[in-house]
Amino acid sequence: MEGNQTWITDITLLGFQVGPALAILLCGLFSVFYTLTLLGNGVIFGIICLDSKLHTPMYFFLSHLAIIDMSYASNNVPKMLANLMNQKRTISFVPCIMQTFLYLAFAVTECLILVVMSYDRYVAICHPFQYTVIMSWRVCTILVLTSWSCGFALSLVHEILLLRLPFCGPRDVNHLFCEILSVLKLACADTWVNQVVIFATCVFVLVGPLSLILVSYMHILGAILKIQTKEGRIKAFSTCSSHLCVVGLFFGIAMVVYMVPDSNQREEQEKMLSLFHSVFNPMLNPLIYSLRNAQLKGALHRALQRKRSMRTVYGLCL
């Protein structure tokens, strides 16, 4: 059997095995979550772009995280919503492979962006006097471009290894969308090489970055405890705790899905964890950052004040 043969033309995403009434309820609920994801991240991105006081490295990285979260959710959620309302639940092979590629690309990029954000916090708190030199705009741009490039390059490697396999037999994917581990189960050949490369990638983008983040936050915690003023400690801790919440949610779920040995009993658990990754995590990120960030709340307040002023001026002109 040749490795470049692909015989199936479409794939069935089993998704949620629920009745029509519950499917409509879930579709409505996830539609609200998806709308909140786009709205929350869109507002954060817009405020950062429009408010000059937020043109700093920390918010530059946060704007890219918002872009990733919107893209991540948009890659997975619309098809999942369509499948809830459609009993057929099929997806063509090429769109499925594209969804797998983008899912991996955005996930890896987010891992690396979160590492960059932790490094930014480390420099800001532990080396405040050298911050503007170390975190220059040139360095920030290079870090962001490297994160995006590595994310898409690693995803491309996995897609090339995936497409060399023959897909000639089963067509049912027990998942909410096309995800690489689930799609690999459809292959009619040994997937050992793919599994090894996936595990190696997990070590590179999950274990390694998480270790760097934890080490950086150990130094950050030591520096925060040395801050003399109570206000300074609270401000530094609130900024870092927001990032730690996001890191804990993202890396914790990803490591359970991709690094815990697979079994048939875990398929439903992985489905729920992937749902959290695709729907809840991107929705919660802007909420976590905005609730604990005085500068973001201040920028939003200024934007609303400007809008009210413009309405007043427009009303007077009329």
Swiss-Prot record:
Subcellular location: Cell membrane
Source organism, top-level taxon: Eukaryota
Membrane side Extracellular: residue ranges: 1-24, 79-99, 158-194, 259-271
Chief subcellular location: membrane
Membrane-spanning ranges: 25-48, 57-78, 100-119, 139-157, 195-218, 236-258, 272-291
Keywords tagged on the record: Cell membrane, G-protein coupled receptor, Glycoprotein, Membrane, Olfaction, Receptor, Sensory transduction, Transducer, Transmembrane, Transmembrane helix
GO molecular function: G protein-coupled receptor activity; olfactory receptor activity
Signal peptide: none
PANTHER family: OLFACTORY RECEPTOR
Full protein name: Olfactory receptor 2A2
Organism: Homo sapiens
Gene behind the chain: OR2A2
